[in-house]
Amino acid sequence: KNANTEKEQMEAKSSAKVLCVVGISQAIMFGIMHYFILYSSWIQANAGGEHAVIDIAKVSCILCGIIFIVLGNFMTKAKRNAVVGVRTVWSMHNDNTWRKSNRFGAICIIITGLLTIITTVFTSGMTGTIFMLIYLLLATIVTVVYSKKIYDKEIKK
């Protein structure tokens, strides 16, 4: 679908930038994970060890936490679209509900990233993964509920 108005063109450019950041962030994350897997395997092969030296789950959780923080900072920059951001029926109602929902969602994702990093540093990788999923689920639920509340306020105006 082609962007007809100048506003739609600006929104499309903004969304494209956010998608680019998402793609680059994921590529970096998987590249670092790949490096740690190869490095751990090399250490293990040379030492004749039976257990991995590096807990890849721990590295993955910390990287995911960093990605959440980065993406949370870019979430507020995305204009209303069908690809990036908090996309509920309520948040898509108008630009105001979109902006408020995505700002709140971004804060939740940043907090999720911080909590994931902190938790993973002090626990094992698998425990960190479980906590990360719990934090992400809670952030999603709270953001969707907030999106509905913003929508309800907007309808009453």
Features from the language model and the residues they span:
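Feature 926 captures the class I aminoacyl-tRNA synthetase adenylation module centered on the KMSKS loop
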Residues: 1-157
